[in-house]
Amino acid sequence: MIDVLGPEKRRRRTTQEKIAIVQQSFEPGMTVSLVARQHGVAASQLFLWRKQYQEGSLTAVAAGEQVVPASELAAAMKQIKELQRLLGKKTMENELLKEAVEYGRAKKWIAHAPLLPGDGE
């Protein structure tokens, strides 16, 4: 006769526990399957945690930071570079316009300067 066991609740591990288990799996002489068995975790789950650890998403979750997909990060970095390029261009335009205004003011001042006695007559 087959004994049917009741549904077991899955154990939820904290981020610190996951990091400790992952770090243990990277130790010399330790294998993923061995560490997984020691902690009652499926090897596939441990491989997933290792991948997340290497991508930095496990530590981001531990620090309470928001995890952003790599594609969104790449798009944001591209947008930042484009905005920095535009800012540099606008800064150069602004400097040129400042110089033009100063040059125009200097010419205007010379054109409207009163003639002093003995200058032209």
Swiss-Prot record:
Alphabetized InterPro entries for the sequence: Homeodomain-like_sf, Transposase_8, WH-like_DNA-bd_sf
Q: Which domain of life is it from?
A: Bacteria
- According to the record, the segments passing through the membrane are none
Role, per record: Involved in the transposition of the insertion sequence IS2.
Key word DNA-binding present:
yes
| Protein name per its UniProtKB record | Transposase InsC for insertion element IS2-8
Q: Which UniProt keywords apply?
A: DNA recombination, DNA-binding, Transposable element, Transposition
GO biological process: what's one of them? DNA transposition
